[in-house]
Amino acid sequence: MFYLLGLRLLKYITFRMAYATIFAFLLSLIVGPHIILRLKKLRADQILREDGPKRHLSEKTGIPTMGGILIFFCVFISLVFWSNILNVYFLIIVFVMFGFAFLGFIDDFLKIKKKTSDGLKARFKVYGQIIFSFISVSILYYLGGEHVSIIYFPFIKSFKMDLGVFYIPFGMFILIAASNSFNLTDGLDGLAIGLSIVITGALIIIAYITSRADFAAYLHIPNIKGSEELVIFLGALLGGSFGFLWFNAYPAKIMMGDTGSLALGAILGMTALILKSEILFSILAGVFIIETMSVIIQVIVYKKTKKRVFKMAPLHHHFEELGWSEMQVVIRFWIIGLIFAIIALSTIKIR
């Protein structure tokens, strides 16, 4: 809205990003208590898995879920004020945000209604993810410009691969994998949102660099015209995420639920696709990938041997069972996530 006024100051990306971040954060602090109270009145409580850590049944019962509503409401309102709402990348990201959030909302709603941890049937959830990812990646493929189907590899500036139309299924895989990985990691107070903040911060740096032709040429990375609006979007997401963490930090007053986790993963995955940072994103999301692999390994080994590799999966529950406190697990995973982010950002220069 402000951007369309044409004021000179609003042409500066860093200015709009800063105020999009602050706006979303402050709005979260203002509306957060009201949303939490409303969800409590609606009895939208987190439904816990009976096979999860036993202490969660006593400590986390009665905490409202669907906290993704808080995140994305504040992000969207901030974007309306500070972003160029006509930018094609902005429109794609917003579609992904609302599409996957809607899917997660249905899942959360069914869990609350049925009073069980089994919400939307797995196949219907996957169908929804396929539909939303196919639409968004296809739009990106046809409107995304000259670099859209090319995969760039860290460390090797001259090595790249053009997937052509096969970029669409590749991009769909990134979105669905990221969405589900973030969903699996959302099990402890502040864990998933804290890791998301780290990734968002790193992607802001990447988005700013790719939006600048001079920086992109110096670092031998593609210059993505129009990607400056991703800096604004990610700034708003960063502010909204910090605002949510204010209430989600231990002991949490609200959980993001599938409404938040499914959409957050998809949003950051789509951002990586637009910025041509698909391989780099696999480093950024290292903790999420490890968490997902722990579940896959646990299931495969147990089916074949009836033995468990981990005391409990995903991996964060394994460390809880080893005696780590919840905050120890969360902060140590944040540290590991930050290390992955530093490694990922360092690859931009090492080419």
UniProtKB/Swiss-Prot annotation:
Cofactor(s) this protein cannot do without: Mg(2+)
GO biological process: cell division; cell wall organization; peptidoglycan biosynthetic process; regulation of cell shape
PROSITE patterns with a match to the protein in the record: MRAY_1, MRAY_2
GO CC annotation terms, alphabetical: plasma membrane
UniProt entry keywords in alphabetical sequence: Cell cycle, Cell division, Cell inner membrane, Cell membrane, Cell shape, Cell wall biogenesis/degradation, Magnesium, Membrane, Metal-binding, Peptidoglycan synthesis, Transferase, Transmembrane, Transmembrane helix
PANTHER family: PHOSPHO-N-ACETYLMURAMOYL-PENTAPEPTIDE-TRANSFERASE, PHOSPHO-N-ACETYLMURAMOYL-PENTAPEPTIDE-TRANSFERASE HOMOLOG
Family: Belongs to the glycosyltransferase 4 family. MraY subfamily.
Protein name per its UniProtKB record: Phospho-N-acetylmuramoyl-pentapeptide-transferase
Species this chain originates from: Borreliella afzelii (strain PKo) (Borrelia afzelii)
Lineage: Bacteria, Pseudomonadati, Spirochaetota, Spirochaetia, Spirochaetales
Gene coding for it: mraY
